[in-house]
Amino acid sequence: MDFHVMTLFPDMIMDGLNTSITGRAIKSGVMSVTAHDIRDYSNDKHLKVDDYPYGGGAGMVMRAAPVCDCYEDIVKNIGKRPRVIYMTPQGYTFTQKMAEDFAKEDNLVILCGHYEGIDERALENIVTDYVSIGDYVLTGGELPAMVVIDTISRLVPGVLNNEESAETESFSDGLLEYPQYTRPADYNGQLVPEVLLSGHHANIEKWRHEKSIERTKKYRPDLYEEYVKKHSDEFR
């Protein structure tokens, strides 16, 4: 899978993603990340890409031309017009289901805004998906873009060592993940649940499922209610 990030800070993107699991996946060729510097498409001798907003107001707005020209260059290089995710607090809140949908694409473009935003005409021309990682404002779209890429990349075949891990983590089935334990079995009097030491796989799976439900009900009642609606037979 190929990610293309349109940004004013390409080093921030690459430094953040060239480590850990995503870094390993990039080095192995399972996925690629290219940070496209929007400033490279400015016709200003100082590579300026912003200007004052029409109608007045605080801050600056990113101009349409550099953004659109950057996108068209990506289209030219990959040979098609891919989906474009614009990271914005005004977008739909990012979820695991959205990540699963995006993971079906061969190419994804992620647009990172800055200043007071981007000229609306650029957004109308190229953006297909408006996505937010939460109801708060950051200084730019780079950190949200990395969150989105990290989440999607875990669903790309070959990125994770254990193919099952992406399927059993929190949210994959609408529930939070069950508690995890490792050695020693006794840590200062705190014991690992006996069922996990039993070797009885059916009982272990039953325990894990029950704990996932308990944890979801306690920490994410909204998800719990949704799960109950979809699995009403389980609670009769």
UniProtKB/Swiss-Prot annotation:
S-adenosyl-L-methionine binds at residues 113, 133-138. It is an enzyme of class 2 (transferase). Its EC number is 2.1.1.228. GO terms for cellular component: cytosol. Its main location: cytoplasm. Belongs to the RNA methyltransferase TrmD family. Specifically methylates guanosine-37 in various tRNAs. This is tRNA (guanine-N(1)-)-methyltransferase. It comes from Lachnospira eligens (strain ATCC 27750 / DSM 3376 / VPI C15-48 / C15-B4).
